[in-house]
Amino acid sequence: MAHAAQVGLQDATSPIMEELITFHDHALMIIFLICFLVLYALFLTLTTKLTNTNISDAQEMETVWTILPAIILVLIALPSLRILYMTDEVNDPSLTIKSIGHQWYWTYEYTDYGGLIFNSYMLPPLFLEPGDLRLLDVDNRVVLPIEAPIRMMITSQDVLHSWAVPTLGLKTDAIPGRLNQTTFTATRPGVYYGQCSEICGANHSFMPIVLELIPLKIFEMGPVFTL
């Protein structure tokens, strides 16, 4: 999860998030290089007093500043497209969970376990126990296994919402009348937090998401739901 004064992205808990962090560093390196070249050109312009008013054109320079940006865009676009297609892949999921957004809570349905349905509300401050996180903990967590592909089916019953868990690299819009899907495979156990990432009304900030990821062997013994 995020920490106060944190610089950078959250630690990755899925292969997709690992790819996103790598792409972030790749793009940031290119941006730093561009900024350095621009600042260097400005420095030379401000410090040199040599001028030449006889230059009418510069074909070589025009060729360079046309081709170079195109190469930079390709270097950014290709890895981005690769990750984009990876996020859309659905490869025989082991478990399917349906998430429905409401103002201002989430409903989850375990379609593979007899249609188990429950609501997940944010815990009010009066109900928080030592160790609970304000505005992030919920009354009913979503319990899922690690090391297994999981498909999330996401929709909304009223307005636009967005189901997002940063440490897993997930952010999928919940749209009324439309069923979106995303898949992920968690790589380590723990409790991971997310929030609604689409402004959805007065209590938009009070729609947390909590995933409790447990080892696959324990989950196969019988899903442990904190209801």
From Swiss-Prot:
- GO BP field: ATP synthesis coupled electron transport; cellular respiration; lactation; mitochondrial electron transport, cytochrome c to oxygen; response to hypoxia
Which residues hold Mg(2+)? 198
The record's catalysed reaction(s) read: 4 Fe(II)-[cytochrome c] + O2 + 8 H(+)(in) = 4 Fe(III)-[cytochrome c] + 2 H2O + 4 H(+)(out)
Q: Where in the cell is it found?
A: Mitochondrion inner membrane
What stretches pass through the bilayer? 15-45, 60-87
Q: How does it sit in the membrane?
A: Multi-pass membrane protein
Does the keyword Mitochondrion belong to this entry? yes
Query: What GO MF terms are annotated?
Result: copper ion binding; cytochrome-c oxidase activity
Q: How is the cofactor bound?
A: Binds a dinuclear copper A center per subunit.
Self-association or partners: how does it assemble?
Component of the cytochrome c oxidase (complex IV, CIV), a multisubunit enzyme composed of 14 subunits. The complex is composed of a catalytic core of 3 subunits MT-CO1, MT-CO2 and MT-CO3, encoded in the mitochondrial DNA, and 11 supernumerary subunits COX4I1 (or COX4I2), COX5A, COX5B, COX6A1 (or COX6A2), COX6B1 (or COX6B2), COX6C, COX7A2 (or COX7A1), COX7B, COX7C, COX8A and NDUFA4, which are encoded in the nuclear genome.
From the record heading the sequence, give the disease linked to this protein. Mitochondrial complex IV deficiency: A disorder of the mitochondrial respiratory chain with heterogeneous clinical manifestations, ranging from isolated myopathy to severe multisystem disease affecting several tissues and organs. Features include hypertrophic cardiomyopathy, hepatomegaly and liver dysfunction, hypotonia, muscle weakness, exercise intolerance, developmental delay, delayed motor development and intellectual disability. Some affected individuals manifest a fatal hypertrophic cardiomyopathy resulting in neonatal death. A subset of patients manifest Leigh syndrome.
Protein family according to the UniProt entry: Belongs to the cytochrome c oxidase subunit 2 family.
Q: What does this protein do?
A: Component of the cytochrome c oxidase, the last enzyme in the mitochondrial electron transport chain which drives oxidative phosphorylation. The respiratory chain contains 3 multisubunit complexes succinate dehydrogenase (complex II, CII), ubiquinol-cytochrome c oxidoreductase (cytochrome b-c1 complex, complex III, CIII) and cytochrome c oxidase (complex IV, CIV), that cooperate to transfer electrons derived from NADH and succinate to molecular oxygen, creating an electrochemical gradient over the inner membrane that drives transmembrane transport and the ATP synthase.
Recorded protein name is Cytochrome c oxidase subunit 2
Its gene is: MT-CO2
